[in-house]
Structures are given as structure tokens and as C-alpha cells.
Amino acid sequence: GAFLHDAGKLLQRGLGSSDALPEQVRNLEGTLCPKAQAGEYYTHKHVLFTELLFHDLEEQGLILPAGLSRRNVRDAAVWHHKPESGPVWGWIVAEADRLASGMDRKAKDAAAERDDDQRTRDFYRRRPLRSILSAVRLGDPAEPEKEGNRFHRPRPADPETIVAAADKHERELPGDYAATTEAFRRDWVALCREVRQTASIFHEGVIGLAERYWWGVPSSTKDEPDVSLLDHSLAVAAFAACLHAHHASRDELCDPAAIKDRSRPKFRLLRGDLSGIQNALFRLGSEQVKGVNRILRARSFLMGQLVEAAGLLIRRRLELPPYVVLMRAGGQLTMLLPERSDIEQTIEAIREEIDEWMATRWAGELALNLGLTEPLAPEAFLRDRIVETLERLRAATEAAKERPLAAFLRKNGPVLRQDYEQGADGHCPACGVRPRKSDFTEDGIARCWACHHEYRLGRRLPKLKQLLWLDGPGDEKALDLFGEVRLRAVVDKDDEYKHRQNVVSGWRPWGAEHVPWPVATRPIANYVPTFDARDLADASKKYRGLEERERSEEAEEPVEIGAIKTMAHIAADAREPDGDRWIGRPLLAVLKADVDNLGQIFGAGLGANRSIGRLVALSRALDWYFTGRLPHLLATRWPDTYTVYAGGDDLLLIGPWRQMPKLAGELRADFGRYCGNNPSLTLSAGIAFVSAREPLNRSADAAEAALEAAKGRPGKDALGILGEVLPWTDPARGLPWLLEKSDWLCARLREDETKTAFAYKLLSFLELKARAEDPVKPDPWAAIWRARYGYFLARTYPPSPAEREARRQPAIWSEFHALMGLDAKGAPPPSKLAI
């Protein structure tokens, strides 16, 4: 009910007027709506449109699934603006509403809701959601905002619609609202028809509908329309669930004074932080690992799902709905919990279970640290206190990270015995550190527990249609995690999980709309390159040196349309056609990138406007770029790129070496558009060039080093590549210059105007130039480079007779002078890198 408390705001904007409401609903105006201070009109009429959702169910004779009381849910949703006249739920939702906003309701909010005024009605129907990303400020908050893509239209979420636009589209907004309202009402009724689903699945289904339809709807059009109805409603539902649990434990649900008391501690914040990700992700044996693509894909996916599993276990043990999970991205989990007498004991018991499982499965390399704050009063979430509250959460998290696996070590000591002493048969060939066991054999290879299940899961992820969480017996394809939690991936109809009664949570990836259940959808960065008809037509030449019928280690079938490419094939995609042959070196590039200054963005980026609702919105917006927008960008623009991981605020991609610098530049430009070209939100990246047989752990380390070099540049927002750090947009010495000059030189080489040997000569001239211009110890003998350069240039591109007569240099000389940086002012361009 708390989650639906403002659902009527969408319907109100979609239907346009209370005249569109059924008379039975319209007659409740005096019952549900408060009056303005002067008493001459009713305000907050969106509650009538929320009432319409329940009227729709009544009209079709529907009840809520899982025994949920339609009356209680309805009362919680519609009474929050007049709680003194309704049931006790109204007080809980009203208080949760204020806490989620980080402030009390302003008087002008009520005054602005004069729905009978045509100007006001047109205003709220034509005011778009402002991107929360455009509100981030790391510099002077008084600095004028730059123009950019700042406005969202209220349309269903997909990789294209989540990108903000520069235009407000005021004329189109009423039509958008009408279409979205119609779709939401239809899907709401359809969700409620499925009476066999559990309460948890129903809750997640409602959240799923909201993620699809509410993300682009402003929760308020009065003051700061930069928090969506989705994010505000999630925060309100989290506070309401915890208030209910807290007061229920003290038998105070019927005590409005206790509910409104903001000085008494009622909440806790919990953060789960997965540490050791980088080492655990790239823990590979020194020899060539069979199935490495699968294993890495599954590892990165599982590491994201471990925090999901922890959140599921915690809320089920505490009997809380899914709304209490505030943020979940990038290996971190943030939850709002009720303050109760059993909270610390319950969390400690969960910590022990998680530590035991993590220590034995990952041999101490990976830890999920749970930091729990001290009890927090409601006033700690108001805007003037939220900074202090978040600092408490950070301190609790850091304290937990300093004691990884502490619960396991207290009980068992530092030596792992069970797996290493019982049934071990040498080291695992995949990770090289954990014990191999014959019980975990797939495709004739025995591995450790973790690598075995990663290998199996990695085969299924590219075709994922459903991700289900089970509480109860699974089947042979289910993966047991800690506590009672099991994970089951479904890839097609033949793979359907039969025991739906055991499913306690689940979702479908974006793009799997044809799968009818579960209703919840999420973006997931699982794009991998596959063979298409053009690849197969060119296979005999493009993939020269590879067996044309080579069995793909991904698909376990001959190379064919739709089969997943191996790293060797991706490397070969770097080659380019030259007549009837393909030329170039088959190499890979590893791209690692992340958002700059993330701590500052969440700590101070929203200034005085920090609230739980805004922080939730900011976290989701960033995560959706990497999990929702990026896969679409790869599939449509860079289809030969392999996703190792992407989510939260960072990514790791592997692709053909020739395309990766261009991909990085386009990625930075697209991220800038997504963020409204906000200078406070920037991206840095590092690229490493490697062979297809290079161990990926070393490749990732090299990309990480390049990324760190980029972040060492003042202002960050740069690309590290081959020992250089380039600004993204500088036309004189940045990435645009590099791409332009390298493409120009490639064209000369391809047309055979310039021999490859001459390119190496240019590099030798640059070496001499650097020695001659060394600011510490210049070499005067190296100054001869200029004469040698001029001689070789004149021999390779001699002037024509007309140019000699006119004493004019060939135009191509100027191009080479620019390539060598002879016309540069200030710092030299990356000439060596371009060549």
C-alpha cells in the first residue's frame, strides 16, 4: 500500500481530470482529500486516482494474491494525506512519505494542487521529469547549469527511452502519460489475476511494473521534479515497512503519537560490500584455461548476485518485503532495516552463515562484509542530518571490511580443512588454487566447486530468460548459495522450472518481454558477440589460421550463425579486407572504465538536496547506464565486443584491438549525453592491447594500470593507452587527434603510398626528437633527426615538377608534419601512439 500511495499521480496526469473518474470514485473526494487551509477547495486529488486502481480490481471481481488484504492495501495507499480520518496505516505512510523526501511537506505543495484550475492541470501534465544526473554538482553550486539532455518522457523503460532529451517535449507529454497510464492499468490488473503467486513474487511484480512505467514520471511537479515516482515510492515503502515492523514489535501500531515520534531510534542502515572482487574474478590457472569465457562470465554475474542473495536472506529472516533494499549495484547492497531487539542477533547469525559459505567456496579470496549502523531516529533522515547518517553507514562498512570473514575465523581458525583434506585430487585447472574434485566434472574436466558451477552457469547466461530464487528443493540446475537461498537460471521453454511454489523471487532480463512470468524485469549486461551471416561468408579468409569448423568452446557446436565467438575469433575480427585478402594482426584490446569521483558524487554531489529518495534515484540512474544502455550500444554499434562485466559504475570489455579506442571515445560521448553533458559526471578508461592467448588476469591488470594512469591526470576524465594519457575531446592532442591521424596513416599504408618501413622510420625520428628535446639532459647529436626526417620525406614523396618550379611543398608533407607534431603549440601530441 505504501508503495502505491502516489500511483494516482501517473493516472491523474494520464486521464487529465477527475471528470474521467467513475462517479463512485469521484464521490470519495470529501472522504479522502484534505481541504486547503482556507477551506475553499480540496487538495491532493491524486489519491482518488490511486483509488481507481482498486476500483478496477473490484469491477473485475479480483482479489490480491497470496492472501493479501485488498482493503488494508487500499487503506494504506489512499489515506496518507488525511491520516487522522482513516485507519492507522495512514499515519505510517504519511510519516514514511515525509522521511523519504528528507523534509516535511511544504505548504506550497498543497496550494499547488488546485486541480480545478486549468492552468495548474496543464502545468503538471506538461512538466517532465528532470534527470537526477543533471542535478549533480561537484564544483560551485551557484555555477549556471550547462545545456544538455536533462528531461525524460514518461514512456516505458528501454535502452533508448532512458536517455534524457534536451527538449521538454511539452506537447507530447499528455499523450505519453495517457499511453503509459493505459498500459500500467492493464498490466496491474493482469498481475493481480495471477492468484497462485507468493506475496514476495507479487511485491516484486508491482516493483517491476513501476520500474517499467514509473521511472520517467516525476513524483512531484511543484518544487524539484528530479526524483521519479519509482524511486520516491521505493523509499516510502522502505520506511513504511520498517516503521510497521518496529511499532509492531512494541505493540504500538494503533498509537499515532508513537508513530510520529521522530526522536526515538526506529531504524538501522545495513550495507553489504563484496571485497576481493578483482582478485577473485581473474583467478585463473597459469596454463590456458578451457572454458575461460564461460567461467569469467559466470563469475562476474555471480558476484553481483551474491549481494542480491544476501539481501533476500536478510529480508526473509526479518520478514520484510523487497522494498527495504534501497540500492543494489557494483558489488554493494544498501538496506533500511527496523530497529528491533533481535536485529543485531539476527544479522550476526546471517553473517556467520555467509562467512562460512564464502570462506569454503572461495578459499578466503572473496568476502561479503555486512556493516550495520547503530539505531537511528527518524530525524536522522531529514535533509540537515542525512550527511551525518551516511557517514555513520560508511564507518560501519569500513569497520566490517577491516574484519573480513571474522565470524568464520573465530569458529574455525585460518586453515581450511574440509575441501582440502576430503576428496581433493590436486589443484583446480581453472583457478589453480582450490582443490579439484571428481564430483565436479563437466565435459571431461574435474574442477573445484566454484569453477565447476561457474562453468555450467556461464554456458546458460547468454540465453537467460528467467532468473529465479528458490526457497526449498531445487533441481539439478539450481545453485545452492548461503542460507536457504538457491539460484536457478532458465534459458528456454524446455528448461522451465516446474516447482513455482518454491520461487520466492525472480526477474526477466530486459528484452525478454515474450516470457510471461515473472513480471519483474531488470537490465543485465550479458552481451556477447555471435557469428552472423557476414562472418561465415568471410570465414575462410577472415579467420585464416583458425579451423573453419572449429568447435566453439561457448556453444559446443560447429561455428554457425548465432554461436558465440571465441577470443581467437574476436581477435581475428580486428583484421580488415584488402581486395581478396584480409590483413592486419589478430589482437585483442581490454577496456576498463569507471565513473570518476564516485564517492564525492554520492557524498556531496546533490548538495543540500540529499534525501534517501534522491540517492536511490542516483544509484539506479548510473547502474542503468552500464546494465541497460551499454549492452544496446554494443549490440548495435560494436557487436564484436565481449562483456566481462558491467554494472554499478564500471565495466570491463574485450574486443578487436583496432576498434577499441573508437569504442572508448563513443562510450564516453554516449555517457556524457546520458548524463546531460554534466561536467561533474565524467568517465575515465584504460586500454591494454594483448594477444588472444594472453592470460586475462594479466590483461585486466594492464588495463587497470592504464585506467589508474588516466585517473592520475588533473581533472581525470581521460583515456590511458600504451603509456599515454589522452583527454577525451582535445582536438590538438587528445583522442580525436589520435584517431584522425592514425586513420590517415592507415589509409596511406593501405593504398601502398607509404611503405610500412617508412612508418618505422617515423618512430625512429620520434625517438631522436625526444632525446634532443629532453628537458633534463638533451642530446645535441640527436638533433640530426630533423634533417633525416626531411630527407626521407622528400625521397618518399618528392615534389612534382610544378611544385618544384613554384617552390611549393607537397600538401602531404604538411600532413606528415602534423603527424610528427611539428606544428603543435604547447605539449606535443601523441605522435608515437598514432603511428
State each model region's role.
Residues 55, 237-248, 301-320, 348-358, ...:
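Alpha-helical scaffold within the catalytic cores of cyclic-nucleotide enzymes
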Residues 311-335, 361-365, 370, 472-504, ...:
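Conserved helix-loop-beta segment at the catalytic/binding core of cyclic-nucleotide signaling proteins
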